[in-house]
Amino acid sequence: MTDSTVFSHKPTLPGDLVVLRPVTEDDVPALLPLYEDAEIMRLTGCHTHFEEPALRKWYASRGAQDDRLDLAVVERATGRVVGEAVLNEWDEENESCSFRIVFVPDAVGRGLGTEATRLIVGHGFEALGLHRISLEVYAFNPRARRAYEKAGFTAEGVLRGALLWEGERVDATVMSVLAPEWAAQGAAG
């Protein structure tokens, strides 16, 4: 991948349960629970408290970023924004990036994350030409790790004591999926 504008196009990715579309400032009210829920903050290892004006500014700027892709996850059945899926930390020379996904509490456990992950990761490999997509998941989030494994991610190693949370050191597992593995999954599934 040599086109430095590869992330400039912000697509809409339709699925059966969800639609991923470019996130906007107007999505902030629906996404506020991501920044207010103590359990979400713990599971994502986020120590920072965000105020709504700062979030509005952040989300308003996402469409102009040419080094990342921030998409809102919209539940088809309700039309409600229930989370976000992001490809970021793009390494152009090595055709790789990081992935993160997060949902408001009442959207968890209904298959929305599985489909959203398949949509954005598939886009990364099939449309953007990435070779590797990686993530980190904390040891106290086994549910997310199982979801990532289900989506085809493989554990590569452990970052020992990567997070200090409430006085305790927490390991993070590095996981990734490679383009050939993704293609083989598609052929098998």
Describe the predicted segments one by one:
Residues 1-107, 169-170, 177-189:
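GNAT-family acyltransferases
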Residues 23, 134-137, 154-174:
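Conserved catalytic-core motifs of GNAT/GCN5-like acyltransferases
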Residues 30, 98, 102, 115, ...:
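Amphipathic alpha-helical recognition patches that constitute DNA-binding helices
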Residues 32, 118, 122, 176:
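A cross-family signal for key residues in well-ordered alpha-helices
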Residues 83, 141, 152:
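Conserved phosphate-binding and hydrolysis motifs of nucleotide-dependent enzymes
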Residues 109-124, 142-150:
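Conserved acetyl-CoA-binding loop-helix of GNAT-fold acetyltransferases
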Residues 125-126, 179:
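A structural signal for the main folded, soluble domain(s) of proteins
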Residues 126-136:
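Conserved GNAT acetyl-CoA-binding A-motif
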